[in-house]
Amino acid sequence: MEKEDKSFGIGMLDYNRENPESSGHSRVAVIRKQKTEQENNNLSWEDRHYIPDLHKSNKIKTPTSLADEKKSHNELDPKAQIKKLMETRSGGTYIPPAKLKALQAQLTDVNTPEYQRMQWEALKKSINGLINKVNKSNIRDIIPELFQENIIRGRALYCRSIMKAQAASLPFTPIYAAMTAVINTKFPQIGELLLTRLIVQFRKSFQRNDKSMCISSSSFIAHLINQKIAHEIVGLQILAVLLERPTNDSIEIAVMLLREIGAYLAEVSTRAYNGVFERFRTILHEGQLERRTQFIIEVLFQTRKDKFKNNPTIPQELDLVEEEDQITHYISLDDNLDVQESLGIFHYDPDYEENEKKYDAIKHEILGEEDDDENEEDEEDSEETSESEEDESVNDEKPQVIDQTNASLVNLRKSIYLTIMSSVDFEECCHKLLKIDLPEGQEIELCNMVIECNSQERTYAKFYGLIGERFCKLSRTWRSTYEQCFKNYYETIHRYETNRLRNIALFFANLLSTDSIGWEVYDCVRLTEDDTTASSRIFLKIMFQEIVEALGLKSLVERLHDPNLVPYLHGLFPVDEARNVRFSINYFTSIGLGALTEEMREYLLTMPKSEPKEQDSEGYSSGSETGSTYSSSYSSTYSRGRSYSRSTRSYSKSRSYSRSRSVTPINNINHKKYIRKDRELSPRGRERSSNRNSYSDLSRSSSLSRGRSRSYTPEGRLIESEDKGYRSRSSSPASRKYRSRQRYRRSYAGSTSRGRSFSRSPSYRRRLSMSCSVSYSRSPSPAARPISRSPARNKRSYDSLSYNRQYSPKVSRKRSNESRSPSPYTLRKQKTYHLNKRNEDFVVKMDKKGSESPVILAPWLREVDDGELYKDRNSESDSVRKQPRAD
């Protein structure tokens, strides 16, 4: 307080000396003195130094002084204002936008330092604003705006702004690196300057033990390495420095750096990559670090085990530069580097206007001339609208020109072909093909071109299969397109030669084995002799063999038993006719896939026989009905037959010999007395088809003998006729609908007894040559031995031998070899045993673990009921099968 009073007193003395007139005792002076003392008491000690000038600020401004001040303000020199900005390195004080525009309007001379300084400040603000706005979504829009600015002049400004922004927000480091990668392709000096400054910044921060600055600079360098702006040797040198004398902080920085560049190092420098991890393992085993740091290293090893799935080299949305366009700078950590600090300070440019024109030319080359034409287009919009309205009326009147040469389609195929051939791997090819602007509805052309290029190769290349697989898994549209291609190529596969056919089959086999297309495409395949060609069968063979090689036979069988695929496999495994079933079985067996046909083999044995169609012919008849012209005998129509019969009763033997060679017209028979309609029964044995063998004439004619005969009509009616002979029951064999040779035939004849006979019908040539057929029959002899007599001859009876002869034209006589074969029932039983044995072997082979599960019935055969198949046929033959044998 004493100092304040003393200073206050000194101030008052000085005040009285400067104003001698106030020393009077006038009233005005006293009032002024009191007022001054009151104001001084309210001021602080620092403000009391300005007390002598306080009275000047309290002077009332007159209107004339205000006008003069306003006039002087309006007449400020813009150069003087700009000079204030140039005095300081930071750029001076803030200038309001309105005042800045006024200054810029007054500065029109380009070659003045003031104008260039204003443009420098504007460039710095523009670059800084664009860098602060960039993110993943708008990076493609920010980069063209950045090229609009003269970043060659402001390259130091760009480096300073982006380093400052990256240090403030580390998660945006990949974005800043991607933007720098694009700029580096056009202006490599900018990328080199940024990398140089980052390396120098890391060295300084490492020497100062500035952890935050080390993390930011090393992180930025890591992403520049991923973008291939910097060589990987810089990252390895930084890791070596950090791991030479490991501390908790250096290990943390090294782990962060390796996590960012680990995926890239694993590709380009595997040896150094493994060496770094060995160093980490050694440090971890030493155990001199904190528990937290050890845990960080363990997490790094887990990241390596996961192949850096959370730290990709370049994120997909930031992959903006082609690999061959990038420029890599080989700068080492130990080099003498120049950061060029002077580039960040304003310098007067005497050739400012010329340099700006040069950059405009470069900008036009990079961005094109679209930006320059925007203003002109805006001015011409009004004129174009008026002209377009007039042109529309004229264009409506002109006829449309349709290009019939398909020039656009040819150009599209050419571009697709060149794209495929210029690609290194399938991923690059798919990426380029997706960028092609396909017209609507022309997607199938791309698929066709991929298949055609594949077919042109000398051998199948998996490159094309991977392309088709990738497209099918991209969207459902491409999958349906390739499924349509499968149907189209299967229908036209006969147009391709064998080598091209093989490549196409392997291509679709790859798509099917990887489930790229659905197996429903087999709906278009019908595997029959009439519906397939040699090319289509080769196509299916190659495709199925490739699928078996990819999936395995067991997986293929399980896939074909999938209930969802059953409606689409009826054409591949037909069950409509026996010949189609047999063809499918033989086809798959011949290509080594007989395991697919095990169920069809069983089905073929039990499948229902189709009803025979009644056919009339001159020489051959399926039954001895009244509508037939001739009555067929046991052998051919024109034949000479011998029969030997041996019957035993009471240990007595008898032989009968009969020979007949005539054609007996049915018209000569008394229809009132002899009425016969045969019911045909299919033989129980399996028929074997042979195109070379002739038809078997196996229908039977009625025996004109005395006795009582009983026969069944096809409708199931029983017709009896009485005669003075024995009673006979007969049944005709199957018709000749299928041209097959029947080896065995069962007949039942004799008086009140049933026997077993084995007969073999002559071949077609033998019938033409009218040769003989020999049949043997053995049956128990009845009490009264009736003898069949021909109506054209007198009836003679012998106890031991009967000889009947009918006259016919002379023909050559030939005897066939005598043979005796097992019954059809025995053959069927043996065949069923072998099939069951083979099925058991197949199940054991399919299940290597030894679990013999029952054979899975094919889904396309489940609808058949075996009971219904056997019901009708067994009912007819059970009565015969249950009869005890007489001998």
From Swiss-Prot:
One of its GO terms (molecular function) is RNA binding. Keywords: Cytoplasm, mRNA processing, mRNA splicing, Nucleus, Phosphoprotein, Spliceosome. Residues 368-394 have a biased composition (Acidic residues). Residues 736-746 have a biased composition (Basic residues). Residues 618-662, 691-712, 747-762, 769-791 have a biased composition (Low complexity). One of its GO terms (cellular component) is cytoplasm. Residues 124-307 form the MIF4G domain. PANTHER family: CELL CYCLE CONTROL PROTEIN CWF22-RELATED (PTHR18034), PRE-MRNA-SPLICING FACTOR CWC22 HOMOLOG (PTHR18034:SF3). Belongs to the 40S cdc5-associated complex (or cwf complex), a spliceosome sub-complex reminiscent of a late-stage spliceosome composed of the U2, U5 and U6 snRNAs and at least brr2, cdc5, cwf2/prp3, cwf3/syf1, cwf4/syf3, cwf5/ecm2, spp42/cwf6, cwf7/spf27, cwf8, cwf9, cwf10, cwf11, cwf12, prp45/cwf13, cwf14, cwf15, cwf16, cwf17, cwf18, cwf19, cwf20, cwf21, cwf22, cwf23, cwf24, cwf25, cwf26, cyp7/cwf27, cwf28, cwf29/ist3, lea1, msl1, prp5/cwf1, prp10, prp12/sap130, prp17, prp22, sap61, sap62, sap114, sap145, slu7, smb1, smd1, smd3, smf1, smg1 and syf2. Belongs to the CWC22 family. May be involved in pre-mRNA splicing. This is Pre-mRNA-splicing factor cwf22. It comes from Schizosaccharomyces pombe (strain 972 / ATCC 24843) (Fission yeast).
